[in-house]
Structures are given as C-alpha cells and as structure tokens.
C-alpha cells in the first residue's frame, strides 16, 4: 500500500479543465497511474497523457447518458478504505479493489447554469452533479489516506509537496484540502437547495427561497470589531468585487470600521458619472463633491465638513493622481480608496506609512448584487439592495414653480447623496457640493435644523441651495426651517397625508419642490 500520503493511483474527472493536463502529466512523471472519465479522459489522452478510463477499470460501462459512471465499489472502496486497517485491506484484496490515493474532481457548473435568466428546471437538474460530490465526500472523509483536490489553484502546491517528499503529500495538507472539499460541497448543495426552494407552484422562481443556505469564506481576522472588546473577522461571499477583492497597497491592516466605512464611501461615489470624491465617518458622508477633475472634487468634498472629516475615509471614482494625493497626504485620513493609484501618486502616499491605500481594478463595476442581510436575534432580515436612483424624467413637480436648470442639477446631486446618509437624512447642496448634512435624527425637522447649523458653522450661505430628504416631510415645519435658511429647491419622495400642507408651505416661500415617489431609508 505504501506509506500514508504516498500517491500511486489518481482519479481525475473535472468540468473546469484549467491546468489539468499539466497536472496529470506531472503526476505521471511521479509514476502515478491515472484513471479518468468522459471528456476529461479525452482531453488528457489528446495531450499524450496515458489514461485508463473508469469504465475499463471497473469493468462496467457508463450508463444512462453518462449519469452513472463512478458509482461503483471499485471506485468508492478505493477511496474509503483505511490503509492501516487490516480488515479493510483484507477485503480490498479479496474483492480486487486497489487503493485510489488522489482524487481530483470539480463539479458540474450548477450555479453558472441557473444564473442564466432563461434557465429551465430541466437544464438545472441536468447540471446537478451526483458522482462528483459522492467521490469528493468519500475521499475527504478518508483524508488520512487520500489527497483530494477540488480547486485547480491547489495543483501547484500539491505537486511541489510531492517533489519535496518523494511523491507523497503530508497530513496537514491532506486535512486542509479535505476541509476545503466539505466547504465546497456544502456550498454546491446550498445553491441547489436555494434554487429549488425558490420555485413557485407554477415553476417560476420567486424572489426569496423557502430555505436559505449561505456560505462565506474567511478573508482575514481583524484586530477587533466595532469596539476593542469585540472579536471580529472579515468574510468573502465569493461574488467578486467590493472591498473583498480590493488590493491594499500600503498602510496598517484594515479594521472592522475601515471596511464598513470604505464600502459605504465607494458605493456613494460610484453613483456619479463625473469625477467624485467623498469623506465618510462612522458610516455617514461628511462631505461629497463632483467636479470636472478629481482634484477639485476632493478639495470641495473636504471643505464640506473639514472638522468631521478628520480621521475619515476618502473614496474617489477616478484613478488617484499626484496632485490629489499631495492634498490627501497633508490631512489626517485613515484610508483612501480609488479605482487605481497612478504611479506618480504612490511615492507621495508612501510618506504616510500608516495610511491605508486600496485600489480596486474596475471601479465602474462596484454595483451591489444579490441580497442585503441584517442579523436580528433569532433570525435574518433579507432584502434586495437599494439600487434605485430616480432620473429627472421620473420626478413630479408639485410646486407652483418648477426648478431651474441649475436647481435641477443641484437636486439630482443631493438626492444621490441622501441615499447614503442615515435616516432621518437631510442634505443641503449647491453646484455639486454638499454644504450641510443632517444625519440620523429621530425627527425630520431636527435633521433639517442640524444641516442648517452645520452649514452656518462652516460659513456656507444656504441662499439658493437645494435640499434632499430621504423620506417625506410629515409636517410643514421642515420646509419652513429650510426656507428660513434660504433654500430654494427641495426634492423628496412625497406620500405624506399632509402633502398638501407641505406643498402649500413650499409655494408660500417660493420654493420649487419635486416628488420622486421613492423613499431611500438607510438604517445602518
């Protein structure tokens, strides 16, 4: 049988054929006998790899259009048998079952199949792998005697270890690979369960499945959570994109709060087509601005509230240039994020060794997909992400006076920002810059007053400014407070039982008011 971990026979059957030919060829160089199935066998033989097909090995042909290939005692006995158990080895000899020391399998692309909008139930069912998961689980259960691979990215490490250990693979590697297999098959079965339980009586998919299986992979441990006494870690969901795939170029390790604030900051600036910057602190934007270039946008975003911005998170939706980097390096910032950091900006930022600098390859692809989750005691709240953003053509002018062209631009700007401010949220802005933000207040009029107070504290003149409210005004008092500060245009969802009273207040003050019909609450 050979010592534990020694590989003399391997079974390879993969749908993802990346690197499999070279992997099999290298195994053969170690004297490993290769068993294979169907398309994998053809691919290997076409490249000169000597292969014994599973049907010839078991003496049993593939049946049922390939549905039955590897479900055979000679396969599963070779994977499950304990190499150091005399009763197992005796039965293997009695029934002619050689040991299979390495299994390389990945599964039918079920998740990719159901991702297609026109996928039928029949197509989905045909892409449920049966033999693959069965072999993987058998091999992983018997990790002490079998090396099992489910990910092409592990081929190189296994080959390197075989080179260093005369054709064997160590116990710690086998255990790690087996653990990876069970995570993989759990995710695979979870996707199947989610899909099937989302089908309604008519066979069409409902929005939410009756049962929900989730799996995340740990990206890193964090020093602590929201507070130092809380333990924390960061997990990936495998969907790609976002901070999970951003590249940290320098600085201290990311904290729990860095990740949360960074996600909010990038999502905000990616709402804008023109160059945009924002500074986020404790989940709320302090200042946001757009402009013809990144430098101007950053200068105006910082000026939106330089006191609150101290120690904040900066996000940009354009590659970070040297001029903007110079400004950032002169201010106390925890982290800066951009689609790329231009070469001449890097040495400037490097002077601030603790400054966390992250680049994400394609900023325009920063669009939240899937579902948004919120843990509550005893359960999980699930909803679609708030991807809505109402265009000017969707607005309804409800005041006697329609907004001017410039006021409409300002309204569109503050409306986008308001979506990312915690409720109750009021945003004041002018010419692509926030000049006062009232966030997280229990009453809307208090949010309006907070925004005015912040603007006055910073020396901004609100005469002619635009205001956005994330939800309707329940009373006219918020309109009156805004008018007293000089606001001349307001955008809000509408829908209050006192809308007529609110509109009357706008008309009394000569304010242009539009309704969007869509609320954008954000509760953190």
From Swiss-Prot:
Pfam families: AICARFT_IMPCHas (PF01808), MGS (PF02142)
Reaction(s) the record says it catalyses: (6R)-10-formyltetrahydrofolate + 5-amino-1-(5-phospho-beta-D-ribosyl)imidazole-4-carboxamide = 5-formamido-1-(5-phospho-D-ribosyl)imidazole-4-carboxamide + (6S)-5,6,7,8-tetrahydrofolate; IMP + H2O = 5-formamido-1-(5-phospho-D-ribosyl)imidazole-4-carboxamide
GO process annotations (BP): 'de novo' IMP biosynthetic process
Cross-referenced InterPro entries: AICAR_Tfase_dup_dom_sf, Cytidine_deaminase-like, MGS-like_dom, MGS-like_dom_sf, PurH-like
Keywords recorded for this protein, A-Z: Hydrolase, Multifunctional enzyme, Purine biosynthesis, Transferase
Pathway: Purine metabolism; IMP biosynthesis via de novo pathway; 5-formamido-1-(5-phospho-D-ribosyl)imidazole-4-carboxamide from 5-amino-1-(5-phospho-D-ribosyl)imidazole-4-carboxamide (10-formyl THF route): step 1/1; Purine metabolism; IMP biosynthesis via de novo pathway; IMP from 5-formamido-1-(5-phospho-D-ribosyl)imidazole-4-carboxamide: step 1/1
Coiled coil: none
Entry's Gene Ontology cellular component terms: cytosol
EC number: 2.1.2.3, 3.5.4.10
The keyword Cell division belongs to this UniProt entry's keyword annotation: no
Location of the MGS-like domain: 1-150
MF terms in GO: IMP cyclohydrolase activity; phosphoribosylaminoimidazolecarboxamide formyltransferase activity
Domain notes: The IMP cyclohydrolase activity resides in the N-terminal region.
Family: Belongs to the PurH family.
NCBIfam families cross-referenced by the UniProt entry: PRK00881.1, purH
Protein name (Swiss-Prot/TrEMBL): Bifunctional purine biosynthesis protein PurH
Source organism of this protein record: Acidithiobacillus ferrooxidans (strain ATCC 23270 / DSM 14882 / CIP 104768 / NCIMB 8455) (Ferrobacillus ferrooxidans (strain ATCC 23270))
Lineage: Bacteria, Pseudomonadati, Pseudomonadota, Acidithiobacillia, Acidithiobacillales
């Amino acid at each position: 049988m050979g010592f534990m971990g020694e590989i003399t026979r391997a079974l390879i059957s993969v749908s993802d054929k990346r690197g499999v030919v070279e992997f099999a060829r290298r195994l053969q160089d170690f004297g490993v006998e290769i068993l294979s199935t169907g398309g994998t066998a053809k691919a290997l033989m076409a490249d000169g790899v000597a292969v014994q097909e599973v049907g010839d090995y078991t003496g049993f042909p593939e049946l049922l259009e390939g549905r039955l290939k590897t479900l055979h005692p000679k396969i599963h006995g070779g994977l499950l048998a304990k190499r150091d158990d005399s009763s197992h080895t005796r039965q293997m000899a009695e029934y002619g079952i050689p040991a299979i020391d390495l299994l390389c399998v990945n599964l039918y692309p079920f998740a990719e199949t159901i991702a297609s909008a026109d996928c039928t139930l029949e197509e989905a069912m045909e892409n449920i792998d049966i033999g693959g998961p069965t072999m993987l689980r058998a091999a992983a259960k018997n990790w002490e005697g079998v090396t099992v691979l489910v990910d092409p990215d592990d081929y190189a490490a296994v080959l390197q270890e075989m080179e260093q250990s005369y054709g064997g693979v160590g116990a710690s590697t086998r255990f790690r690979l087996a653990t990876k297999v069970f995570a993989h098959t759990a995710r695979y079965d979870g996707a199947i369960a989610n899909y099937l339980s989302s089908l309604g009586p008519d066979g069409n998919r409902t929005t939410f499945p009756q049962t929900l299986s989730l799996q995340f992979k740990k990206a890193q441990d964090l020093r602590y959570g929201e507070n130092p006494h809380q333990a924390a870690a960061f997990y990936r969901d495998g969907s790609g994109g976002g901070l999970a795939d951003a590249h940290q170029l320098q600085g201290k390790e990311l904290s729990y709060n860095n990740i949360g604030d960074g996600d909010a900051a990038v999502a905000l600036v990616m709402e804008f087509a023109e160059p945009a910057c924002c500074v986020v602190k404790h989940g709320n934007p302090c200042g946001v601005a757009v402009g013809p270039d990144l430098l101007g946008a950053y200068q105006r975003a910082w000026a939106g509230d330089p006191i609150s911005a101290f120690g904040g998170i900066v996000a940009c939706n354009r590659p970070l240039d040297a001029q903007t980097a110079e400004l950032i390096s002169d201010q106390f910032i925890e982290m800066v994020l951009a689609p790329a950091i231009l070469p001449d900006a890097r040495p400037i930022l490097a002077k601030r060794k603790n400054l966390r600098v992250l680049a994400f390859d394609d900023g325009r692809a920063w669009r939240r997909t899937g579902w948004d989750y919120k843990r509550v005691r005893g359960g999980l709240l699930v909803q679609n992400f708030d991807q809505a953003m109402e265009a000017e053509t969707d607005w309804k002018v409800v005041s006697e006076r329609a907004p001017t062209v410039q006021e409409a631009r300002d309204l569109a700007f503050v409306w986008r920002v308001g979506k990312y401010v915690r409720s109750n949220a009021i945003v004041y802005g002018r010419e692509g810059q926030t000049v006062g933000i009232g966030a997280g207040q229990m009453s809307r009029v208090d949010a309006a007053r907070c925004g005015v107070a912040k603007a006055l504290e910073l020396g901004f003149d609100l005469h002619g400014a635009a205001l956005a409210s994330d939800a309707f005004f329940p009373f006219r008092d918020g309109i009156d407070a805004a008018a007293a500060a000089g606001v001349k245009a307001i955008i809000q969802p509408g829908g209050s039982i006192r809308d007529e009273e609110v509109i009357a207040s706008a008309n009394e003050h000569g304010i242009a008011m539009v309704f969007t019909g869509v609320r954008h609450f954000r509760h953190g």
